[in-house]
């Protein structure tokens, strides 16, 4: 059992990295990877949000939405899975709002550094994608807990690595036409190629 969860965690972080394998959450990934401090803050926020929303959405899906989930209420044939997207967005929005209030109260500097991108986590496709992958792969509650943490950790690892590279690029002689997003896209592409080396690993 432990080996299964460990392989699921490694797979979520490296083999199926949200940012570098599926290219999810690219908006905030590119916008907030200019400074290491902001990248670390957003990475931690994404880890927290995914670690909470994926298992919560798993419990809601298996307890209320999937076909036959309401058998306990005498409604064995009811299928509410069409409400999945709406429900997941609601859960994500609530968790992000709570996180925003906590950061505003206890970490105002980080809250100001993240700015508008913190509430944008609500519509970050990496956050939504993790919940949709969880449903598609029919994870148990325990698996969804590990997968949510791993997916967030993988995304955080990618943005922190990119931030480190971009800080070094400030002192490099980058051709004028590639400065800014141009060299950043090339860097992300090379990072993705690096992470492709994990794709042949069977876990």
From Swiss-Prot:
Recorded GO MF terms: oxidoreductase activity, acting on NAD(P)H, quinone or similar compound as acceptor
Transmembrane segments: 12-32, 36-56, 82-102, 115-135, 145-165, 181-201
Primary enzyme class: translocase
Compartment list: Cell inner membrane
Keywords: Cell inner membrane, Cell membrane, Ion transport, Membrane, NAD, Sodium, Sodium transport, Translocase, Transmembrane, Transmembrane helix, Transport, Ubiquinone
Subunit organization: Composed of six subunits; NqrA, NqrB, NqrC, NqrD, NqrE and NqrF.
Name recorded for this polypeptide: Na(+)-translocating NADH-quinone reductase subunit E
